[in-house]
Amino acid sequence: MNSRILCDASLRGRRSLAGPWYWRLSIHALGMAMLVSGGCALQPAYVTPPLATPTAWSAQRELSERQTVGGDASWWHLLHDDAIDALTKAAFADNPTLIQALSRVEEARADLGVKGAATMPAVDLDANVTRAKSRNTSPIQSGVTMLSNSASAGPAFSWELDLFGRISQSVDAARDHLDARTADAASTRLALAADVANDVLSLRACENSRRVWLDDIASREKTLSLTRLRLNTGLASSVDEARILTGLASSRTSLATQVDQCARQVNALVALTGQSSDVVRRHVGVTQAGPGVDQVFMPRAPRALPELPATVLASHPDVVSAEREAAAAWADIAVARADRLPRIDLAAALSGQWIRAAGSSLDFNTWSIGPSLTGPLFDGGAGAANVRSAQARYTRATANLQATVRTTTEDVENALAEQVSAAARVTSTREGVDAAHTTFTVSNDQWKAGAISLFELEDSRRQFASAQDAEISARRDQGQAWIALVKATGAAITLTPDTTSHE
C-alpha cells in the first residue's frame, strides 16, 4: 500500500476577470519554479574510485628515441598488409557484433534524450466536442427535449520541479550509460580489428606450412623413385622402400591436417567480414599452388612498447566503460533517494469554452494554474529497499572496475612477455632452419653417394621440415603478440625507430 499526500492550489476564473494580477501571479509562480528547480543535493558528487595501478610495466624498457602513436584508431595500417586493411574495412561495414554494439550506443543516446526531456516543461493540447440530448420528465413540462452542443480547446502546461535532483541525476546516469556504450563500441571495434589481423596472420602461416609439407612430399617422392631404381639394381632393400613410404604417408597426413586448419581460418575470416571464401583467399594471397612456390607474405610487426600504466588505464575502452558504469550507479543512488521524497509539479491550463443550448450560445475562457505536492506516506519499505539495491549495484560496479583494471594490467604484461618470447623464438628458429637446411643438403648428397643410410637422410629431412614449420609459427606468434599488445593497451603504444621494416 502506498498513500500519498496531494495538495493542489489552483486559481480559476473567466477571461473577463483576468486582470494584471493574474499575470503577476504567473510570473511569481514561474520564478518560484525556477528557484525550486535548482534542486538539493542528496549525496556528494561522484569521484572516480581509487585504482590500484602499477607505476611501470615489469617488462618496460627505456623510453628514449620513440615515436608516439598512442590511440591510433587505424593501428592495423602499421603492419603494411593490404589484406588486413581490406578485410578490416569489410568487417567494420558488415559485422553483426559491431552493429549490435553501435545500436546499443544509439539506444543509450535515445534514452538520454528521453531523460533530458523531463527537465523541460511539457505542453499538450486538450480539445473535445460534445453533443447531448436531454428530456424533461417532470410533470410540468413532461416530454420536452433539449439538444446542446459544447466544445473546448486549449493548451495544458506541466512541469515537475527537480527539487531533490531526481531528474538531473537520471540525466547524469543516462549520460554515463551513453559514455559506457560508446566505450563498449570502441572496444568491440578494437577486438574485431585484432581478430581479423590475427586470423590473416594465422591463415598465412597455415598456408606457408602447407607449402612446406608440399615441398617435403615432393622431395620424398623423388627419393622414393630413386630408392626403387636402386631396389631394382640391388643397391637398396625393401626395408628402405618401406621406410620412405612410411615417411611419405606421415607427411601426407600432416598436409591433410594443415589443409583442414587453413580452411578453418578462411571460414573464420568469412564469418568476421561477411566476404566470400574466394574473396578472402584472393586478398590473403592463398592459392592452391603446388610445391616449389614461394611462401606468402608475412608482415613483420613494428617494435612497440605500451604507454605508462596511468595512460593506458585512463584511455582503455574497457576501463572507461567500467568507470562510466560506476558513475551511473552512483547517480542511481541519488535517484532512489529522491524517489522517497516529495515531488512538486507545476500545472497550468488555458481553455476556450463554447456552449449552445435552447437556441442560445455562450462562450468564455477559463484558466488554471497551481502547484501540486505528492509524497509517500507508507510504502512498506520499498523506497529504502530501492536505495539499498542501488548502493549494491554501485558496489558491484566499482568491483567490476577494479577487476577490469587488473585484467587489463594482466593482458598488457602477458603481451609484453609474449613479445619477448616470440622475438627470441624467431631468432632461434631462423638459425635452426639455416642449420637444418645445410644438414639436409649435405645428407642428401651423401646418401646419393652411398655414404650414409636412408634412415639418416630421412631424419635430416624431418628435422628440416620441422625447423621450417617452427619458424613459420614463431613469425606468426611475433605478429600476434604485437596485436595482443595493441589490444591490451587499447592502442596506447609507442614505436621504436625501426617501424618501417617489414617483409
Language model feature labels by segment:
Residues I99, T119-L147, S158-S187, S209, ...:
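Small/polar (Gly/Ser/Thr/Ala-rich) solvent-exposed segments
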Residues I84-A86, E107, S150-S152, N198, ...:
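Transmembrane beta-barrel architecture of outer-membrane proteins
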Residues M1-W21:
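N-terminal secretory signal peptides that target proteins for export/translocation
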Residues D94, A101, E160, I167, ...:
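Amphipathic alpha-helical coiled-coil segments and their boundaries
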Residues T48, A249-D278, A336, A422, ...:
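Short segments within alpha-helical structural elements
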Residues N2-I5, R24-A93, R175, V259-A314, ...:
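Terminal intrinsically disordered/low-complexity segments used for targeting and assembly
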Residues I167, D176, T182-L308, E418, ...:
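Periplasmic alpha-helical coiled-coil/stalk elements that build and connect Gram-negative outer-membrane
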Residues G70-L79, D126-A156, V279-L305, T311, ...:
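Small/polar, glycine/serine/threonine/aspartate-rich low-complexity segments that form flexible
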